């Protein structure tokens, strides 16, 4: 039974009774534990996890400055929803929304609205709901039978899973425009074939999770414009900018994907990706209040004042919001640009190293978004797979995913590196060396064939 020696306050951590016991898993321990000991035991429980800084699978930020960590730690107790109790926190959130509206080129004549969320998944849910409610209102006004069939959402098959969740939760038909070797982002040649009077909207992705590719949102806007000129039911665009919307404005400000395009009505992003904040904080903005139906804005009075709220989640710490504002203040536009340009340079170095092996076909080189994505060439003539390479890199501490592309391209296995703001030049150089060594080790490994009469599976001896 897990218990404590409360009398021995000065006992060494590893001389304590608790250090000789397994940590509780199914039932809470009866007695309290000295905080020093509890801290060390929990810390040790996490000791065999991978290094977050070497995790090239995640988009999420894994480094913040000590001052940012300090201000976030000092504000963890603040409840973001309690805006009457914490009016200055609410003001910082509003300031972040204003800065994003400026970054995404909202027209001064429009009355934009926005909110923080726990991440892009919640933000996507809000954007999807706004499109559905607005479609339903317009459909009823136009005399369309809204019960004749499900409303639909059109998106590339390279979507993030939150969109599938949205469609399941709110009973929407998910119409996927298939990816192909020729179209690794949304296929604008055929996308309008998926649109009809029951379509609530189209999602353009600024940074597809699988490959890092950008949908051509400018062309998509033109197609939607032509459609709306000849149909009663207006179709709108939501931009899923979870990754790209906090990166592209700083490195490619001339690219038109945002509110400069008249049919883009809402944009979401993840502050905990290229907004450079620890998880989790996201943002969503609507270009004008007409695109956020009134029934999705709720008035909360029982926290001590009448405050509108539009988020799905309720109580959560305001520390990430404050961390986002700290970054905006600390870095400014030029600081973000410098960080992101250096991050992109690191991605380009990695893609060059991959290309120089002669073994891989690169799908994304990191020039648009610092995501490097590639597959083995059909004529690579190697006995190992990308899964083997991922395993070998993991032995050196790097977490690098290998996975199949969506559905129609499910037989294509790719590998992806996500370069974040904390991937410094020393880490880029170390990874290039480890990649080269891993490939050499795989090429020189002795292969053990398990069954000569079936397709070859193999392991490596050392």
From Swiss-Prot:
One of its GO terms (biological process) is glutamate catabolic process. Its EC number is 4.1.1.15. The gene is gadA. GO terms for cellular component: cytosol. InterPro entries: Glutamate_decarboxylase, PyrdxlP-dep_de-COase, PyrdxlP-dep_Trfase, PyrdxlP-dep_Trfase_major. Pfam families: Pyridoxal_deC. GO terms for molecular function: aromatic-L-amino-acid decarboxylase activity; glutamate decarboxylase activity; pyridoxal phosphate binding. Its cofactor is pyridoxal 5'-phosphate. The modification N6-(pyridoxal phosphate)lysine is found at residue 273. Belongs to the group II decarboxylase family. Converts internalized glutamate to GABA and increases the internal pH. Involved in glutamate-dependent acid resistance in gastric fluid. This is Glutamate decarboxylase alpha. It is an enzyme of class 4 (lyase). It catalyses: L-glutamate + H(+) = 4-aminobutanoate + CO2.
């Amino acid at each position: 039974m897990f218990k404590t020696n409360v009398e021995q306050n000065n006992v060494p951590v590893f001389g304590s009774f608790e250090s000789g016991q397994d940590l509780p898993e199914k039932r809470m321990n009866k007695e309290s534990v000295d905080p020093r000991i509890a801290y060390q035991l929990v810390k040790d429980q996490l000791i065999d996890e991978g290094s977050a800084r070497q995790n090239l699978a995640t988009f999420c930020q894994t480094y913040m400055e000590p001052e940012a960590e300090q201000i976030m730690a000092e504000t963890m107790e603040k409840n973001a929803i309690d805006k009457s109790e914490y009016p200055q926190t609410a003001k910082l959130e509003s300031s972040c929304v204003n800065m994003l509206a400026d970054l995404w080129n909202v027209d001064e004549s429009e009355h934009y609205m926005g909110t923080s969320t726990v991440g892009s998944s919640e933000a996507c849910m809000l954007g999807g709901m706004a499109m559905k409610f607005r479609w339903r209102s317009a459909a009823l006004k136009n005399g369309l039978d809204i019960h004749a069939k499900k409303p639909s959402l059109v998106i590339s098959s390279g979507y993030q899973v939150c969109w599938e969740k949205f469609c399941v939760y709110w009973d929407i038909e998910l119409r996927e425009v298939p990816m192909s070797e020729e179209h690794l982002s949304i296929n604008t040649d055929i996308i309008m074939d998926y649109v009809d009077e029951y379509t609530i909207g189209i999602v353009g992705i600024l940074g597809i999770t699988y490959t890092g590719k950008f949908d051509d949102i400018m062309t998509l806007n033109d197609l939607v414009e032509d459609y709306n000129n000849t149909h009663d039911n207006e179709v709108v665009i939501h931009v899923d900018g979870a990754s790209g919307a906090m990166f592209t404005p700083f490195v490619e400000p001339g690219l038109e994907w945002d509110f400069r395009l008249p049919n883009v009505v809402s944009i979401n992003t993840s502050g905990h990706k290229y907004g450079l904040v620890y998880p989790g904080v996201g943002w969503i903005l609507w270009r004008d209040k007409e695109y956020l139906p009134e029934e999705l804005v709720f008035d909360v009075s029982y926290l001590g004042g009448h405050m509108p709220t539009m988020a799905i989640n309720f109580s959560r710490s305001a520390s990430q919001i404050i961390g986002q504002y700290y970054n905006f203040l600390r870095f400014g536009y030029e600081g973000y640009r410098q960080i992101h340009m250096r991050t992109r340079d690191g991605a380009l170095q990695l893609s060059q190293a991959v290309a120089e092996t002669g073994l891989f076909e690169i799908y994304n080189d990191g020039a648009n978004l610092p995501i490097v994505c590639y597959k083995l060439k059909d004529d690579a003539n190697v006995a190992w797979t990308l899964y083997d390479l991922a395993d070998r890199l993991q032995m050196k501490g790097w977490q690098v995913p290998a996975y199949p592309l969506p559905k129609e391209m499910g037989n294509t296995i790719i590998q992806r590196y996500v370069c974040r703001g904390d991937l410094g030049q020393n880490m880029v150089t170390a990874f290039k060396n480890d990649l080269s060594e891993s490939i050499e080790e795989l090429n020189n490994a002795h292969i053990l064939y398990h069954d000569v009469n079936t397709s070859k599976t193999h392991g490596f001896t050392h």
